[in-house]
């Protein structure tokens, strides 16, 4: 059976330093409607920003629906499609027995995703996917703005 998505989320994250000031962005499409979400964090990593973009996009949904999340992050896609169930059943431990990195965000994604309604799609970074390119630019600008804001306050 082919599943038709109601909502398309394209997400990306950026970090200046890793760790350092970071930004995230999400483009949500529903029919002809588009909404842009973005933000920044003072000290973070690129992976946390990728995950935050997906969290904020899913959190902004107002009803249950089929969702396609497009990301250039294999870390995010594989975490959600290959590792999450195992991590959860292992008490949030990795295969090596160590605590899963970014557990707090994985748990938020787990709660928001409702695994039967979210499809995770990987596209190559800077591969010409229009929404992904736009999210990349917005996430980078959010990271830069966060860095400027920090400089103004410190």
Each PLM stretch: what is its role?
Residues 8-21, 55-138, 143:
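RNase H catalytic domain
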Residues 1-48, 52, 56-66, 137, ...:
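RNase H-like nuclease fold core
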